[in-house]
Amino acid sequence: MIPPANHHDAPPPAAPRPKSGCLRGRLHWPEQRAIRTIIGFLGIALGAKVVHRVRYERGDHIPATGPAIIVANHLSSTETLAMARLVTGHHRFPHFLAKAEVFTWPLVGRVLRAARQIPVFRGSDRAADSLAAASREIERGHVVCLYPEGHFSSAPDLRPGPGKTGAARLALQHPGVPVIPVGMWGPRPGVKHIWHRHTVRLVVGDPVGLSGVPRTDEADVYRAATELIMSRITELAEQARGARFDAV
């Protein structure tokens, strides 16, 4: 049986952060949150425009309103900005799941917290908090973005690796919410790319249909749904790459 989504209304789990009280005592929480969200949105949108040339196909698969779960392959940290450009370019605001350590980086962490991005505490008893926070954003009608691999591709040809079950769990808890797969391709940033913008290509696919996943053992359901999601992402990544990956 698929466990029900967490309906408790609360902000995303708190990530490690430096102390700051520049807004405390002057504005009430709703006003603070609105200002911080605007700052975060502008920071992410500006970063996305500066770092990459983004080329995308079939972006109209991203729904204009209502919740959505966007899943993609994971090439590098900066490709998240390309994903943000795709989503904001279609007048939606993304809520990414990102490793908690990133929230401690100077400036970057402030922008992520301001934009209500979701920290992931890997290998800890707080790991489930991330999916609960993502579930709350979905219930608010927002767009949640995940990389099911959970880490950068380690394959020589950057083929997407096996996925973790978090995205499938989230999708099966919200059966009416579209799961939008995205395949990304671009050079992995390195020394030779550091001084100029590089092009990232994104191909957006039709929503992944999970209704046909056999409802047997719970763990098997999550694995089957994850494999289906990753197969669609891999197909789209090949389209973005313009060539098939090596057979495995």
PLM features: residue spans?
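Non-catalytic C-terminal accessory region of glycerolipid acyltransferases
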Residues: 2-23, 27, 35, 128-248
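Short, flexible loop segments at the rims of nucleotide/cofactor-binding pockets, characterized by
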Residues: 45-51, 120-124, 156-158
